[in-house]
UniProtKB/Swiss-Prot annotation:
<feature type="binding site">
    <location>
        <begin position="200"/>
        <end position="201"/>
    </location>
    <ligand>
        <name>S-adenosyl-L-methionine</name>
    </ligand>
</feature>
<keyword id="KW-0687">Ribonucleoprotein</keyword>
<dbReference type="GO" id="GO:0009536">
    <property type="term" value="C:plastid"/>
</dbReference>
<keyword id="KW-0808">Transferase</keyword>
<dbReference type="InterPro" id="IPR000692">
    <property type="entry name" value="Fibrillarin"/>
</dbReference>
<dbReference type="GO" id="GO:0003729">
    <property type="term" value="F:mRNA binding"/>
</dbReference>
<dbReference type="GO" id="GO:1990904">
    <property type="term" value="C:ribonucleoprotein complex"/>
</dbReference>
<keyword id="KW-0698">rRNA processing</keyword>
<feature type="region of interest" description="Disordered">
    <location>
        <begin position="1"/>
        <end position="68"/>
    </location>
</feature>
<dbReference type="GO" id="GO:0008168">
    <property type="term" value="F:methyltransferase activity"/>
</dbReference>
<keyword id="KW-0539">Nucleus</keyword>
<keyword id="KW-0694">RNA-binding</keyword>
<dbReference type="InterPro" id="IPR029063">
    <property type="entry name" value="SAM-dependent_MTases_sf"/>
</dbReference>
<dbReference type="GO" id="GO:0006364">
    <property type="term" value="P:rRNA processing"/>
</dbReference>
<keyword id="KW-0489">Methyltransferase</keyword>
<dbReference type="GO" id="GO:0032259">
    <property type="term" value="P:methylation"/>
</dbReference>
<feature type="binding site">
    <location>
        <begin position="220"/>
        <end position="223"/>
    </location>
    <ligand>
        <name>S-adenosyl-L-methionine</name>
    </ligand>
</feature>
Amino acid sequence: MRPPVTGGRGGGGFRGGRDGGGRGFGGGRSFGGGRSGDRGRSGPRGRGRGAPRGRGGPPRGGMKGGSKVIVEPHRHAGVFIAKGKEDALVTKNLVPGEAVYNEKRISVQNEDGTKVEYRVWNPFRSKLAAAILGGVDNIWIKPGAKVLYLGAASGTTVSHVSDLVGPEGCVYAVEFSHRSGRDLVNMAKKRTNVIPIIEDARHPAKYRMLVGMVDVIFSDVAQPDQARILALNASFFLKTGGHFVISIKANCIDSTVAAEAVFQSEVKKLQQEQFKPAEQVTLEPFERDHACVVGGYRMPKKQKTPAS
């Protein structure tokens, strides 16, 4: 175990749970063959609201000033838990010394004297971090992975995915807004494993020459036709047997029915497009009426073993 180090000042941390599961934030729903059954429904519509994107939550997501901090590996490869007076989700900074969105950084000294810098991952500003703290079984984004990220915005979560996949991996980050795209491009100048693409994710043919086959697609486009957008991109870029992670915002699809009904409808749409959803977790309390669905794509049928 690494020796304790002193964390700097900042906002409060986020409870990560001892096993990195974030037990206090609701479980997920398994779609058959998963690790669990129905571990927890998406929260009711009246619950405490997660802070709007880009604001709220602990402002810098750091550790309490003056506390001793120990960094331990999370069960998801490339993710870590910083434990002090408050626990926080962190990733190993691919570009030490550089912050992306004014996030708190923690420096840990190894026994051999070398230092490793980690960046606090704020779940109020990242759907993927919220899903991890919600107890998602597998995000499929790991060191060396090639990821297509749809709806990259200014690159907050993309930067942490960049940390996760490391120098051997690659993140193709697609964003339609030119304003957000400027921030994304600036971030990518220092992160050589991020390839920013300022295009509409509805038209993957426009960037087919820029993107290779990928292991995982992460989608956070918040559009009524987001299942179709994911399917279009998967048909171009997602390898057979690859995986997807999609953030679903119920109000963007149908604000007239319960969030749970919207999630069920979207899962059915995904199943019709050769996706095999494996689990669903709520993003409460970080985001209201959001769910994250994870699964496989064009999964090979299991071979029946002949009787001996």
